A protein has these predicted regions:
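Acidic, divalent-metal-binding catalytic cores of TOPRIM
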Residues: 1-284
Length: 284
């Protein structure tokens, strides 16, 4: 089925609007939002308390839906759909594991800064510039790119520690709380700002890998025994079959094995089961 959104400029948008609707939420008004940091923060902020205790609000657990789209085990299939080439030339799972572990210290600083209502220790714009990857060197599964990132992260972390020495100890307790909510160095990318992950990390990877895969496919066609019109037709058929990488990523549905998605799925299943039970009990 398809849900059509009314095309009206005066409709209120955003999470703040939905937060204001929590008191009115019910079986007739179910709210669905990106978690942002609210799941991780548990009861550290007023908004996180509201989100985590709202009976009729479902949230992503991951920072946003973009993080699901960028689930590492699903990215190879994005390349296959975009290039029509299923050759595995890059291990996305291994790279994202290393990437996530690398940016983990800065993620903690950014998250800690975000939950402070009066201080702006490490704002989003600085986090973005520190964890983005400007390029991907495919050799050795991106190791040179990761080395470049590690140097940048180390410099930024050292600067933050020097500027904010009194925050180092409180951050240790903060980290323990976040780990209690399921955060690990390996899955930190699922909890980071979603558009930063998609636009400044994953799209860089996909563009580089897909460019190589397309070049491989074209080289294979060119090296075939076909000539003249037959060769032109095969080349045209291939290029016409290609899809926009971003469009394929936005259509990605292969994140259903992600543990955070499964948790959301269980929440919905429990709600449906509870609703059916209540309807039967009331004779509806």
């Amino acid at each position: 089925f398809e849900i059509s959104v009314p095309n009206r400029a005066d409709l209120p948008k955003g999470k703040k609007v939905l937060m204001g609707m929590i008191p009115r939420s019910s079986d007739e008004l179910i709210l669905c939002v990106d978690s942002d940091f609210d799941f991780l923060f548990a009861d550290r902020t007023e908004q996180s308390r509201e989100v985590n205790n709202a009976r009729y609000m479902f949230h992503t657990y991951a920072y946003a839906t973009e993080n699901f789209l960028c689930y590492a085990p699903s990215l190879h299939n994005v390349c296959v759909k975009a290039t029509k080439n299923d050759t595995r030339i890059f291990d996305f799972v291994r790279f994202m594991h290393e990437y996530s572990c690398t940016i983990y210290p800065l993620f903690l600083w950014y998250a800690y800064s975000a939950q402070l209502s009066s201080e702006n220790v490490f704002p989003l714009i600085d986090f973005k510039s520190a964890v983005r990857i400007g390029y991907l060197d495919l050799a050795d599964n991106g190791e040179k790119t990761l080395e470049w990132l590690r140097r940048n992260v180390a410099k930024r972390e050292e600067m933050l520690r020097k500027r904010n020495p009194k925050m180092i100890e409180p951050m240790k307790e903060f980290e323990e709380q976040l780990r209690g909510r399921g955060l690990t160095p390996e899955n930190a990318y699922l909890f980071m700002h979603g558009h930063t992950l998609m636009d400044n990390v994953v799209m860089i990877l996909l563009n580089s890998v897909c460019e190589k895969l397309r070049a491989m496919s074209i080289a294979k066609i060119t090296a075939s025994k076909k000539q003249g019109v037959a060769l032109k037709n095969e080349m045209a058929n291939y290029t016409n079959s290609l899809r926009s990488i971003r469009d394929v990523l936005l259509d990605n549905e292969n994140y259903t094995k992600c543990p955070l998605y499964k948790r959301l799925q269980r929440d919905i299943e429990k709600y449906i089961a509870r609703t059916i039970w209540n309807m039967k009990r009331s004779g509806a």
